[in-house]
Amino acid sequence: MEDAKWWNVFPLSPGLLPKFLLFVSVVSVANSMQCYATLKFTKRVYSGKPFEVNGLSSRTFGTWTLLAALVRFYAAYNISNGAVYDICTGTFILAGWHFFSEWLYFGTAHIGEGLTGPLIAATTGFFWMVSQRDYYLALPAQ
């Protein structure tokens, strides 16, 4: 039996995409916790109209983010499962739609420290997953 190593917690599938999914999942869990603890960081994301951020909207956003984290975490370890892969891709589509619409249509978000990270994660995740779909779905199940 191979010695247990701390890095064995990382997804075994080749490439960086599964590790990226694990990373954004962990970051999203941390973001979800802060959404329940304080409005400070949620108001940074929605800096265009911070007065619209309240406890309920922050907790709802935290719950939505936690659900996306769960899907992305599962996909990190099941990257060759087509249904899981597609649902995970959908989380990036929804996140991108949300953040871009809050910025460009509703005006509740402005480009800055609160919005830049989520926009980068959503667009990077989406384009990476779309471009690598055939490769990862051709892998044997882990």
What name fits each language-model region?
Residues 26-52, 62:
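Hydrophobic transmembrane helix segments
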Residues 65, 86-102:
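Hydrophobic alpha-helical membrane segments
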Residues 1-10, 118-142:
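C-terminal helix/juxtamembrane-tail motif
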Residues 1-28:
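Cytosolic juxtamembrane helix and N-cap/initiation of the first transmembrane helix
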